[in-house]
Every structure is written in structure tokens, then in C-alpha cells.
Amino acid sequence: MNIIDLRSDTFTQPTDAMREAMAGAEVGDDVFEEDPSVKKLEQLAANKMGKEAALFVPSGTMGNLVSVLTQCNRGDEVLLGDQSHIFLNEVGGIAALGGIHPRTLPNQKDGTLDLDALDKAVRSKNLHCPPTRLICLENTHNYCQGTPLTPAYMENVAKLAARHSLKIHLDGARIFNAAIALKTDGRELAQE
């Protein structure tokens, strides 16, 4: 009997064909950027997302951590949803490893953050508070029933971020799910 476990996409298992492909893959030294499989995967990801380059990391948690640490300094603040994966399921990595202050706002049922609340939450000039540097979003939003963030919403957040000279990080672990649900592609959902 085949059992389908729908608790999380993390329960997926590779097929026999996938295992064979991994076992037969050409490998090289990753330190010297000589692993052709990784280079090909990174180029494929960059092309699918319309980006100049991509970086392979072994987990979504590491991808989020690298991205947030790249865009913030110790003592900076990140605004993110109270139901976001980064806040709930990534062992406080941005605070523990980066000294970055996570400040949560309530996620709406559709995974969005209220734009007025987000606008009011931005801090930059008060020397008693950590300066806000980054807004983190998640698409699709895992704890909000897998709802996708629309390009229109993302554009509104981008305009808000630009007004405050903030950066945006998109946790896109399920971005292709969002693209399918919205009948678009990853490029549109990851525009700068």
C-alpha cells in the first residue's frame, strides 16, 4: 500500500530515478567551483528566476540565514510576519548568529502583512531602537494555508521599502507553488 504523507513537503522522498541520477552525477571540487553539477544547478536556478547568479546551499534555513546576514549588520532590525518560517522554525538563527533583531507583525490570513502597520513599524531615526533594514516575506506562506503573495502585493511592499530605503528578502522555498497558483513564473514573483 502506498501512503501519501501531506503533513509537509519536507516528507518527500527521492524516486529511484532521482537516486540513480545523484549516484551517476559528475562531481568536482566545490571549493574551487569545479563541481559541474552544482554549477549547472546554480545556472538553472538563476535563469529560472531571472537573476545574474544563484548560490546552492543545502537547506532553506541556510538560504534564509545567508540572505538576511548579507543584507543586515549586527544590531539591525528585520520586520517579518509572526507566522513566518524564519521566525518560527529557524532556531532564531538571525538573532543568534547575526545579532539581528526580529520584529514581528501579525500575518493576515492570506500571508500578507498589513501595509499600514508595516509602514508604521519602520524605525530608522530613533537611537534607542535598532534601525529597520529589511522586510522579510514568504511566498507561498506555509503557516497561512500555503497562500501565494500576488505580484501586486509584492509591488506595494517594494514601493514601501523604497520609500524607507529598506531591502526585501523573499523566503521563496515554495515560490514555484506560488507561480503555479498565480499562473505566472518565478521571475515575476522575484522582481527587484
Locations of regions flagged by a protein language model:
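Conserved PLP-enzyme active-site core in the AAT-like
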Residues: 1-192
